Amino acid sequence: MSRIGKLPIHVPAGVTVTIKDNVVTVKGPKGELVQEVNPDINVTLEDGVIHLTRPTDDKNHRALHGLYRSLINNMVVGCSEGYKKELELVGVGYRVSNTGQLLDLSLGYTHNIYLQLPKEVKVETKSERNKNPLIILESADKQLLGQICAKIRSFRMPEPYKGKGIKFVGEEIRRKSGKSAGK
């Protein structure tokens, strides 16, 4: 058995799960998510617990078993508690502001970068004096949230010499020493 796939998924109170024709729908206080499951993987819901089974111990089936268990678990957690990520802008003159779902980033380029966020992602920006600006993103969809964070981070990746760029809060950037002075 797959170490991850064999684990049951407990559905918390306030979250409803429906399974119909290999499509799993999870509704909760934070939103609604839908995931299509491979027809080879069998998904059952009994007494508030989701179980996944596979037909054979074939390598492909073992991989899919763990994959879909993790995806459905992420959906249940996302719809009940939600996911939150914080990005920090490190650098002189780096600024961020938002107007609704439009993010305005000033990252030292000759132009500002505007990013339209999907409606499933809630965004909040914090800019305090003498502190690095923060972007706080919340969503029920873990995959979408990670993709948006990676896109924002790609505009100015943290560099190893001064540590300037967009990084996750609490992330350690591996630093390098600069050029050694000549004799």
Swiss-Prot record:
This is Large ribosomal subunit protein uL6. Pfam families: Ribosomal_L6. Belongs to the universal ribosomal protein uL6 family. GO terms for biological process: cytoplasmic translation. GO terms for molecular function: rRNA binding; structural constituent of ribosome. The gene is rplF. It comes from Parabacteroides distasonis (strain ATCC 8503 / DSM 20701 / CIP 104284 / JCM 5825 / NCTC 11152). SUPFAM superfamilies: Ribosomal protein L6. Signal peptide: none annotated. This protein binds to the 23S rRNA, and is important in its secondary structure. It is located near the subunit interface in the base of the L7/L12 stalk, and near the tRNA binding site of the peptidyltransferase center. One of its GO terms (cellular component) is cytosolic large ribosomal subunit. The lineage of its organism: Bacteria, Pseudomonadati, Bacteroidota, Bacteroidia, Bacteroidales.
